[in-house]
Amino acid sequence: MHDRLIIFDTTLRDGEQSPGASMTRDEKVRIARALERLKVDVIEAGFPAASPGDFEAVQAVARTIKDSRVCGLARALDRDIDRAGEALKDAQRARIHTFIATSPIHMRHKLQMSPDQVVEYAVKAVKRARQYTDDVEFSPEDAGRSEEDFLCRILEAVIDAGATTLNIPDTVGYAFPEQFGHMIGRLIERIPNSDKAVFSVHCHNDLGLAVANSLAAVLHGARQVECTINGLGERAGNAALEEIVMAVRTRKDIFPCHTDIETREIVACSKLVSSITGFPIQPNKAIVGANAFAHESGIHQDGVLKSRETYEIMSAEDVGWSTNRMVLGKHSGRNAFRTRMQELGIEFASEEELNSVFQRFKVLADKKHEIFDEDLQALITEAGAEAEDERVKLVALRVCSETGEIPHAQVTIKVDNEERTGTSSGGGAVDASLKAIESLLHTDTALTLYSVNNITSGTDAQGEVTVRLEKGGRIVNGQGADTDIVIASAKAYVNAVNKLLAPIQRTHPQVGDV
């Protein structure tokens, strides 16, 4: 018998905790829509109690998503659970995910509570969450370093209290596949009422074993895996959704389960998350990397030409890679533009939004002879960033650069609708431009990353620039794209500055009193 494996995506919550990967409300909604097209079972939209912005983002996702279940994270605190319940009240299907630490070191030093008190708080939290929804997930934080007898005790208690999913996290990425898989199997066997709940795992990648640990758990009875697109997450990241899904699909001889994921949406969703967060996909990344289905060796190439199955264990088309590329240009009409966007999984909320992005497309088409899918994705990302309430806007940029001379840049920006113009010189055109912007803003930030990637091939290709700024412990990424790399750099810098200027008071889910 083949059971269904539930795919729980936490890109919007745990993935966003990657330094610099913060997303706006509208960006989260766009990713949530992509996850829904991917047919993800559960979308963890955020931690509503973290900040007003997080609450609004979870609320917006809950109001938008119709098919996937929308989940909100909450500590085992009444105020957190109530906040999650309020954010999720408009969801078609809601889940509250509550947790408390269960390892001796966490109970003693972080919670300063006895094991009995921890069980009491966990049971109380689950019962309160059940007042808002009949779908409640419970996680014993730092389960990998918890005593197994205590884990059995607290998990049995929360099932009796109404928990329908039990999630076992490897919080610090310390577990090893054989050991972790056997632990899941023992918990299922030892807990008397384990048949009344779905067992789930949430693995971190500190030792590069997140996917392996998750799959080992599936082999021992886990029927939900928590994962993220591209493996995005804190520190070394989380288990990569695309790798979990394709491993289970490809090795049906090993795994006694299946997922309902629409795998042809994987690559599009991966590119969207990468574009929004500014975290590039490494070329040799499994499934979604540019080289994942490339063959350099002559022997391999010869084999693939004769029969793809000789060196390919899965089809590139099955995960969304396509050789059928529709190329648009300046003569392409609005209908062709809309149709291609729909084929890429991009829907517009209104005719006004469609018209706005189409006008950007026409401007780009005047600069480029051919517009590829990657150009369209960049247009959407840029339009989404500028749709927010930005305090700083780039108005004009003029650069003077001659051989043997120091480059100069003149920049005009709007700050809270007040126009400002400044000039600066630098070691190059990009350096001069960014210095000119900084001279008008005085943000006193540190530029810790500057990278350029060509979106497509050709000398008229758009360049996509990612910058990372740090100030006062905050880290943000900014993105910009243009056929002129200097303008793309200025756009990226302004995008990052706007994120820094946005007010934020966020509580980390693993920090705070109980």
From Swiss-Prot:
Keyword Cytoplasm listed: yes
Pfam families the record matches: HCS_D2, HMGL-like, LeuA_dimer
Entry keyword set: Amino-acid biosynthesis, Branched-chain amino acid biosynthesis, Cytoplasm, Leucine biosynthesis, Manganese, Metal-binding, Transferase
InterPro entries, alphabetized: 2-IPM_HCS-like (IPR050073), 2-isopropylmalate_synth_dimer (IPR013709), AIPM/Hcit_synth_CS (IPR002034), Aldolase_TIM (IPR013785), LeuA/HCS_post-cat (IPR054691), LeuA_allosteric_dom_sf (IPR036230), LeuA_bact_synth (IPR005671), PYR_CT (IPR000891)
EC assignment: 2.3.3.13
Role noted for this protein: Catalyzes the condensation of the acetyl group of acetyl-CoA with 3-methyl-2-oxobutanoate (2-ketoisovalerate) to form 3-carboxy-3-hydroxy-4-methylpentanoate (2-isopropylmalate).
Positions of Mn(2+) binding: 14, 202, 204, 238
Example of a GO cellular component annotation carried by this entry: cytosol
UniProt-recorded Gene Ontology molecular function terms: 2-isopropylmalate synthase activity; acetyl-CoA C-acetyltransferase activity; manganese ion binding
Oligomeric form and interacting partners: Homodimer.
Compartments (UniProt record): Cytoplasm
Gene (UniProt): leuA
Protein name: 2-isopropylmalate synthase
Pathway: Amino-acid biosynthesis; L-leucine biosynthesis; L-leucine from 3-methyl-2-oxobutanoate: step 1/4
Domain (Pyruvate carboxyltransferase) ranges: 5-267
